[in-house]
Curated annotation (Swiss-Prot):
Belongs to the TRAFAC class translation factor GTPase superfamily. Classic translation factor GTPase family. EF-G/EF-2 subfamily. It comes from Streptococcus sanguinis (strain SK36). Disulfide bonds: none annotated. CDD domains: EF-G (cd01886), EFG_III (cd16262), EFG_mtEFG1_IV (cd01434), EFG_mtEFG_C (cd03713), EFG_mtEFG_II (cd04088). It comes from the Bacteria. The gene is fusA. This is Elongation factor G.
Length: 693
């Protein structure tokens, strides 16, 4: 079957926002106007098309990023609806990795909120062009220009309106298009009847002022336009649109639009902006990767003629078809029934069926082309972040960064019958979600699950009960501490056992140095002259990795350390991989005596919003919890406090804040970084762990 839409007419976009900004409702309206659904589903009624998991419909939040494909103005738009809750950031990250552009949805009463900052930062990291949709213009307190100012103040974004609202709150009735300099007035509730009129007289002056600001801001990104602007020449609408498109695709400019998805206003104009300003797969740089055979960098331009290359970005278990692997095709063509190579794992995989998804319903297709997003049935070994390529043209694409879990809890099956089912359920859930880890405590035999927050683990335990019918008892949440070395040191690990029969002999000298935060463990082989034979080097690294899983102070994993193997010796007969593994672990234990080991704890960026009169209470809360205030700002009658607080001190804070503010205060927290715990706290943690051992 030939390609239905050319690459120029394809858009791969994500819809991202802070929780409750109206993101899923916006996606619903897109599906309604593009003819995908005939009845609009409201999120607050639990009937939304994109929120298809049971818990999503109950909680009214989006958990998994449902992918769907729609058509608008002779273009294909592939949309991924991503969650706005901080506990599900991996869903946002993996979506951004495979998208070409994004729509950031704001609540126009609040503007930029904490999770908006997180997803914005992630989108900037991946170089994703964005347009901004200031939603909920019908809401009490909606303020479009305030929302735009928060984009400048909190995100330092070069964002400018390309529209202005006509009225706000209950009086929100239309939109001024600053490019055409026309007003779009809505005359019915479904938003399908739109009148294009001249701008109402009372809005004309404001529209001219903002059109001028827009032209000036765009001209700064385009030399030719700047010359025309400075010489006072007329800039045509086409020139302005072309310059906005170029600057948006280069991530130098962010157009801001307004509307109310709930009241069906502004969504079609936002879809027009997706087509006008966000890139097609041809507008973005060709994807880069490493050829595993030559270790050279190669590129794959977006073209059907190039060899097939795709990235798997999500695994999902479907009750009817089994394991689904969502993937983005960067180049080439793939037919169902063909074989591909998973270059990340070095395994050959057969593509069973190829499905194009609409939330959770599916259409089977024969072929996918460059620029498409689809799901495959039948892949056994592929996980999130793996590259799938033509067997004759191997390439490993950049994978997806997976944040480390910060919270853990113990789960135990309620009955013997639940025991086996729980193992299978947890394994399937961990396959779908790389930020969810399952481990067994070696000493106690307990199963420990870790994730990105209480809600994250809550949802997963809930899914275990509903989807896999496993009943489990759940322990109290615990903090995922880490350990590290703060001083460089050198240590010897010497292991010798000779008591009849074949002996064991391993001898290594290793230099340990602190690594940058977040860089993890790095191993370097600096052996010269074969004093440790080449075949034993991997055993040394393995021995270190295994012993770093249980740190020296309190048994927490050791992170952010470099190890350089620089000397050692071996025995012709008695040396073995096992002996060198043991020697490496002895070197680590020895190094710990002089490397100033420290315990690290997760620090959360906490944003607390309270009435003015409770500001003093909140400052007290932060100090009492070993936190430090990073900044404050007033918004209406509320105060917004940003602070860094250890996760360990935040358990139960919701109750404290509720009683201090008579239920009017709210807070959001997102993991920010790991930091050394104070000495007194470190001693307590060590004592507690020794007491339990």
């Amino acid at each position: 079957m030939a390609r239905e839409f050319s690459l120029e007419k394809t858009r791969n976009i994500g819809i991202m926002a802070h929780v409750d900004a109206g993101k899923t409702t916006t996606t619903e309206r897109i599906l309604y106007y593009t003819g995908k659904i005939h009845k609009i589903g409201e999120t607050h009624e639990g009937a939304s098309q994109m929120d298809w998991m049971e818990q999503e419909q109950e909680r009214g939040i989006t958990i998994t990023s449902a992918a769907t494909t729609a058509q608008w103005n002779n273009h294909r738009v592939n949309i991924i609806d991503t969650p706005g809750h901080v506990d599900f950031t991996i869903e946002v990250q993996r979506s951004l990795r495979v998208l070409d552009g994004a729509v950031t949805v704001l609540d126009s009463q609040s503007g930029v909120e904490p999770q908006t900052e997180t997803v914005w930062r992630q989108a900037t990291e991946y170089g994703v062009p964005r347009i901004v949709f200031a939603n909920k213009m019908d809401k009490i307190g909606a303020d479009f220009l305030y929302s735009v100012s928060t984009l400048h103040d909190r995100l330092q974004a070069n964002a400018h309106p390309i529209q202005l609202p006509i009225g706000s709150e209950d009086d929100f009735r239309g939109i001024i298009d600053l490019i055409k300099m026309k007003a779009e007035i809505y005359t019915n509730d479904l938003g399908t009847d739109i009148l294009e009129e001249d701008i109402p007289a009372e809005y004309l002056e404001q529209a001219q002022e903002y059109r001028e600001k827009l032209v000036e801001a765009v001209a700064e990104t385009d030399e030719d336009l700047m010359m025309k602007y400075l010489e006072g020449e007329e800039i045509t609408n086409e020139e302005l649109k072309a310059a906005i498109r170029k600057a948006t695709i280069n991530v130098e400019f962010f157009p801001v639009l307004c509307g109310s998805a709930f009241k069906n206003k502004g969504v079609q104009l936002m879809l027009d902006a997706v087509i006008d300003y966000l890139p097609s797969p041809l507008d973005i740089p060709a994807i880069k990767g490493i050829n595993p055979d030559t270790e050279e960098e190669e590129t794959r331009p977006a073209s059907d003629e190039e060899p097939f290359a795709a990235l798997a970005f999500k695994i999902m278990t479907d009750p009817f078809v089994g394991r689904l692997t969502f993937f983005r095709v960067y180049s080439g063509v793939l037919n169902s029934g063909s074989y591909v190579l998973n270059t990340s794992k070095g395994k050959r995989e057969r593509i069973g069926r190829i499905l194009q998804m609409h939330a959770n319903s599916r259409n089977e297709i024969e072929t996918v082309y460059a620029g498409d997003i689809a799901a495959a049935v039948g892949l056994k070994d592929t996980t999130t972040g793996d590259s799938l390529t033509d067997e004759k043209a191997k390439i490993i694409l950049e994978s997806i960064n997976v944040p480390e879990p910060v919270i853990q809890l113990m789960v135990e099956p309620k009955s013997k019958a639940d025991q086996d089912k729980m193992g299978v359920a947890l394994q399937k859930l961990a396959e779908e979600d790389p930020t969810f880890r399952v481990e067994t405590n070696v000493e106690t035999g307990e199963t420990v699950i870790s994730g990105m927050g209480e809600l994250h683990l809550d949802v997963l335990v809930d899914r275990m009960r509903r989807e896999f019918k496993v009943e489990a008892n759940v322990g109290a949440p615990q903090v995922s501490y880490r350990e590290t070395f703060r001083a460089p040191t050198q240590a010897r690990g010497f292991f010798k056992r000779q008591s009849g029969g074949k002996g064991q002999f391993g001898d290594v000298w290793i230099e340990f140095t602190p690594n940058e935060e977040g860089k993890g463990f790095e191993f370097e082989n600096a052996i010269v002259g074969g004093v440790v034979p080449r075949e034993f080097i991997p055993a040394v690294e393995k021995g270190l990795v295994e012993s770093m899983a249980n740190g020296v102070l309190a048994g927490y994993p050791i992170v952010d350390v470099k190890a350089k193997l620089y000397d050692g010796s071996y025995h012709d007969v008695d040396s073995s991989e096992t002996a060198f593994k043991v020697a490496a672990s002895l070197a680590l234990k020895e190094a710990a005596k002089t490397a100033q080991p420290a315990i690290l704890e997760p620090m959360m960026l906490v944003t607390i919003t309270v009435p003015e009169e409770n500001l003093g209470d909140v400052m007290g809360h932060v100090t009492a919890r070993r936190g430090r205030v990073d900044g404050m700002e007033a918004h209406g009658n509320s105060q917004i406090v940003r602070a860094y607080v250890p996760l360990a001190e935040m358990f139960g804070y919701a109750t404290v804040l509720r009683s201090a503010s008579q239920g009017r205060g709210t807070f959001m927290m997102v993991f920010d970084h790991y930091e050394d715990v104070p000495k007194s706290v470190q001693e307590e943690i060590i004592k507690k762990n020794k007491g339990e051992a």
